[in-house]
A protein has these predicted regions:
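Alpha-helical coupling/stalk and coiled-coil linker elements that connect catalytic or binding modules
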Residues: 1-31, 63
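Short, well-ordered loop/turn elements at secondary-structure boundaries
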Residues: 17, 40-41, 64-65, 100-101, ...
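Structured core elements
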Residues: 20-22, 33-36, 70, 77, ...
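Short alpha-helical segments and helix-capping/turn motifs at coil-helix boundaries
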Residues: 3-7, 31, 107-109, 213-217
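Generic structural motif
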Residues: 3-7, 134-135, 296
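Acidic, Mg2+-coordinating catalytic modules of nucleic-acid enzymes
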Residues: 155-170, 174-329
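Switch/communication elements of ASCE P-loop NTPase nucleotide-binding domains
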Residues: 22-158
Length: 329
């Protein structure tokens, strides 16, 4: 019996096994191996090659059709700054590598990418029991230009979590923003969410600090998106519209959202500028505090008194803790 040796050399394997990709900084002149890059950078470089290949195929195809490019969740393994840069630079990069206009569809769950995009180019998709709801933010902007200008500026400067939340809680200020999450956890421990299967702490809700003066501007927007919302705001009692007052002596409110809400409940025209009576605010029923999927809450009387703000209401129901005497009723 004779033994033979067959050598199999494949040029593809030789190149793959013996070649190392490096990155060189033009100014420093220092080369680093690709292993020094994170997965986010590697994915970004891979996408660059895929896009270049896609562009080349379009040039060779010579068809009259508009080429479509779908990029699904590019934020995977990218840090926020990289997501922002990628979303902003994508169209510029495509215009550099191709003379043909490429219509791009980019799907994402990233608030950073949504924050980079022009609102008129955003299409909101929501899965419901009846199917997928698809909404054009550009259409909302045309119908509500004033609201859209404010929402666009606010979300751009703060956060776009609203697009990816199952529900949203709008709060008055920093106190509510800090206390509400803790209150939700304590309510859960006390069993106040029972018998709900998926309790609020396990749901994806967005907590957005917006202030009582502007929360009403978001109401048409969340109604358009179909997102349930809760507004927690201050009653802000006033004597005559200019002078602050304790609730028991107040005549109206300075809170624009509450005034907007009462006008909606009473069916008053938007042009109506008459003062909203504090009595009408206090007497709102639970049903009247709900419009579609939006609900509003503010301070109510406890221990014979009604606080003007959340801070006053907390002190009122914890008088012993704060060393306050019992209220005179």
């Amino acid at each position: 019996m004779q033994l033979g040796v067959n050598t199999k050399l494949q040029i593809d394997n030789q190149i793959k096994d013996q070649t190392e990709l490096t990155y060189t900084a033009p100014l420093a002149g220092e080369a680093l191996p690709s292993s020094h890059n994170g997965l986010g950078y590697k994915n970004l470089i891979k996408m660059e090659f895929l896009l270049a290949d896609f562009s080349e195929k379009i040039k060779q195809d010579h068809t009259a059709c508009i080429p479509l490019l779908f990029v699904e969740e590019p934020e995977s393994h990218m840090h926020p700054q990289m997501q922002h840069t990628f979303a902003g630079y994508l169209q510029t990069f495509l215009s550099k590598i191709s003379d043909v206009h490429i219509q791009t569809f980019l799907t994402s769950h990233s608030a950073h990418i949504a924050n980079t995009m022009d609102f008129s180019n955003i299409r909101y998709a929501q899965k419901t029991k009846r199917g997928v709801v698809y909404k054009d933010l550009g259409a909302f902007g045309e119908e509500n230009p004033e609201n859209m200008d404010f929402i666009k500026k606010y979300l751009t400067l703060s956060r776009c979590d609203l697009f990816f939340a199952d529900k949203v809680i709008f709060v008055e200020g920093a106190s509510e923003r800090l206390l509400v999450p803790d209150m939700i956890e304590k309510c859960d421990k006390l069993g106040l969410f029972a018998p709900i299967t998926y309790k609020l702490p396990a749901q994806y809700y967005a907590l957005i600090e917006i202030g009582g003066a502007y929360a009403y501007k978001f109401i048409p927007f969340v109604r358009f998106l179909g997102i349930p919302c809760l507004i927690i705001t201050d009653i802000d009692a006033m004597k005559d519209g200019r002078t602050k007052s304790v609730v028991s002596k107040g005549k109206t409110t300075s809170n624009s959202t509450i005034k907007w809400w009462v006008r909606q409940v009473k069916g008053l025209p938007s042009a109506d500028k008459s003062k909203i009576k504090l009595e009408d605010i206090i007497n709102l029923t639970a049903d009247e505090k709900t419009i579609d999927k939006c609900h509003i809450e503010f301070q109510v009387a406890e221990n014979g008194l009604c606080g003007r703000s959340l801070e006053e209401a907390i002190k009122n129901v914890n008088r012993a803790f704060y060393g306050l005497a019992d209220p005179v009723t």
